[in-house]
Amino acid sequence: MIVVGYSADPFGRAAVEHGIEEAKRRDTGLLVINATAGDAYVDARFARSGEVHDVEAHLQDSGVPFEIRQPVGVDATEELLTAMDSPDAELLVIGIRHRNPVGKLLLGSVAQRLLLECPKPVLAVKPHGF
Protein backbone atom coordinates (compact mmCIF):
# COMPACT_ATOMS: atom_id res chain seq x y z
CA MET A 1 0.00 0.00 0.00
CA ILE A 2 1.13 3.52 -0.84
CA VAL A 3 0.21 6.14 1.77
CA VAL A 4 -0.33 9.71 0.54
CA GLY A 5 -0.39 12.75 2.80
CA TYR A 6 -2.94 14.93 1.01
CA SER A 7 -3.49 18.66 1.38
CA ALA A 8 -6.05 20.63 -0.62
CA ASP A 9 -3.49 22.48 -2.74
CA PRO A 10 -1.16 21.84 -5.71
CA PHE A 11 1.32 20.05 -3.41
CA GLY A 12 -1.31 17.58 -2.26
CA ARG A 13 -2.46 16.99 -5.82
CA ALA A 14 1.16 16.29 -6.86
CA ALA A 15 1.44 13.79 -4.00
CA VAL A 16 -1.71 12.00 -5.22
CA GLU A 17 -0.38 11.87 -8.81
CA HIS A 18 2.93 10.36 -7.71
CA GLY A 19 1.10 8.03 -5.33
CA ILE A 20 -1.00 6.71 -8.21
CA GLU A 21 2.15 6.14 -10.30
CA GLU A 22 3.85 4.28 -7.46
CA ALA A 23 0.75 2.17 -6.71
CA LYS A 24 0.54 1.12 -10.36
CA ARG A 25 4.28 0.41 -10.49
CA ARG A 26 4.08 -1.75 -7.36
CA ASP A 27 0.66 -3.27 -8.14
CA THR A 28 -0.82 -2.15 -4.83
CA GLY A 29 -3.49 0.14 -3.40
CA LEU A 30 -3.48 3.71 -2.19
CA LEU A 31 -4.41 5.19 1.19
CA VAL A 32 -4.97 8.95 1.00
CA ILE A 33 -4.95 10.75 4.35
CA ASN A 34 -6.12 14.36 4.72
CA ALA A 35 -5.99 15.12 8.45
CA THR A 36 -6.40 18.25 10.52
CA ALA A 37 -5.60 18.93 14.15
CA GLY A 38 -7.94 21.88 14.28
CA ASP A 39 -11.31 22.86 13.01
CA ALA A 40 -11.89 21.62 9.48
CA TYR A 41 -13.61 24.91 8.64
CA VAL A 42 -10.50 27.02 9.26
CA ASP A 43 -7.76 24.67 8.01
CA ALA A 44 -7.07 25.64 4.38
CA ARG A 45 -5.27 22.34 3.74
CA PHE A 46 -8.26 20.24 4.81
CA ALA A 47 -10.23 19.20 1.74
CA ARG A 48 -13.87 20.24 1.52
CA SER A 49 -16.49 17.81 0.22
CA GLY A 50 -16.20 19.04 -3.39
CA GLU A 51 -12.43 18.62 -3.35
CA VAL A 52 -12.74 15.14 -1.85
CA HIS A 53 -15.25 14.23 -4.57
CA ASP A 54 -12.79 15.41 -7.26
CA VAL A 55 -9.93 13.39 -5.75
CA GLU A 56 -12.18 10.36 -5.40
CA ALA A 57 -13.30 10.62 -9.05
CA HIS A 58 -9.67 10.94 -10.19
CA LEU A 59 -8.66 7.91 -8.13
CA GLN A 60 -11.56 5.88 -9.54
CA ASP A 61 -10.46 6.80 -13.06
CA SER A 62 -6.91 5.67 -12.26
CA GLY A 63 -8.00 2.09 -11.66
CA VAL A 64 -5.97 1.88 -8.45
CA PRO A 65 -7.77 0.49 -5.38
CA PHE A 66 -7.97 3.30 -2.83
CA GLU A 67 -9.27 4.54 0.49
CA ILE A 68 -9.59 8.16 1.61
CA ARG A 69 -9.46 9.07 5.30
CA GLN A 70 -10.20 12.52 6.72
CA PRO A 71 -9.67 12.44 10.48
CA VAL A 72 -10.40 15.69 12.35
CA GLY A 73 -8.83 16.68 15.65
CA VAL A 74 -5.68 14.61 15.15
CA ASP A 75 -2.04 15.38 14.50
CA ALA A 76 -1.48 14.86 10.76
CA THR A 77 2.09 13.69 11.26
CA GLU A 78 1.07 11.07 13.83
CA GLU A 79 -1.76 9.89 11.60
CA LEU A 80 0.63 9.36 8.68
CA LEU A 81 3.30 7.70 10.84
CA THR A 82 0.69 5.35 12.30
CA ALA A 83 -0.45 4.41 8.79
CA MET A 84 3.17 3.73 7.84
CA ASP A 85 3.51 1.31 10.77
CA SER A 86 1.13 -1.04 8.95
CA PRO A 87 2.88 -4.10 7.50
CA ASP A 88 1.14 -3.34 4.17
CA ALA A 89 2.54 0.20 3.93
CA GLU A 90 5.46 0.39 1.49
CA LEU A 91 5.98 4.07 0.75
CA LEU A 92 4.82 7.46 2.02
CA VAL A 93 4.29 10.22 -0.57
CA ILE A 94 4.10 13.86 0.53
CA GLY A 95 4.07 17.19 -1.24
CA ILE A 96 6.84 19.56 -0.23
CA ARG A 97 7.15 23.31 -0.72
CA HIS A 98 10.12 25.39 -1.79
CA ARG A 99 11.10 27.45 1.22
CA ASN A 100 12.83 30.79 1.70
CA PRO A 101 16.11 30.72 3.71
CA VAL A 102 14.33 30.81 7.07
CA GLY A 103 11.83 28.20 5.90
CA LYS A 104 14.67 26.00 4.72
CA LEU A 105 16.11 26.08 8.21
CA LEU A 106 12.77 24.98 9.62
CA LEU A 107 11.84 22.78 6.58
CA GLY A 108 8.28 22.55 7.82
CA SER A 109 7.48 20.66 10.95
CA VAL A 110 5.28 18.05 9.28
CA ALA A 111 7.68 17.27 6.42
CA GLN A 112 10.70 17.27 8.71
CA ARG A 113 9.15 14.89 11.22
CA LEU A 114 7.96 12.56 8.48
CA LEU A 115 11.36 12.46 6.78
CA LEU A 116 13.14 11.83 10.07
CA GLU A 117 10.70 9.51 11.84
CA CYS A 118 9.02 7.46 9.12
CA PRO A 119 10.12 3.81 9.39
CA LYS A 120 9.83 3.30 5.62
CA PRO A 121 10.80 5.24 2.47
CA VAL A 122 9.36 8.72 1.94
CA LEU A 123 8.93 10.29 -1.49
CA ALA A 124 8.75 14.10 -1.29
CA VAL A 125 7.39 15.69 -4.47
CA LYS A 126 6.63 19.15 -5.85
CA PRO A 127 4.11 20.13 -8.51
CA HIS A 128 5.49 21.12 -11.91
CA GLY A 129 6.51 24.77 -11.96
CA PHE A 130 7.14 25.12 -8.22
Swiss-Prot record:
Effect on the protein upon substituting residue 104 to R: No acetylation is observed
Record-given protein name: Universal stress protein MSMEG_4207
PTM-bearing positions, type N6-acetyllysine: 104
InterPro entries reported in the protein's UniProt record: Rossmann-like_a/b/a_fold, Universal_stress_UspA, UspA
Family: Belongs to the universal stress protein A family.
Pfam families: Usp
Post-translational modification: Acetylated on Lys-104 by PatA in the presence of acetyl-CoA as an acetyl donor.
Taxonomic source organism: Mycolicibacterium smegmatis (strain ATCC 700084 / mc(2)155) (Mycobacterium smegmatis)
CDD domains attached to this UniProt entry: USP-like
Keywords attached to this entry: Acetylation
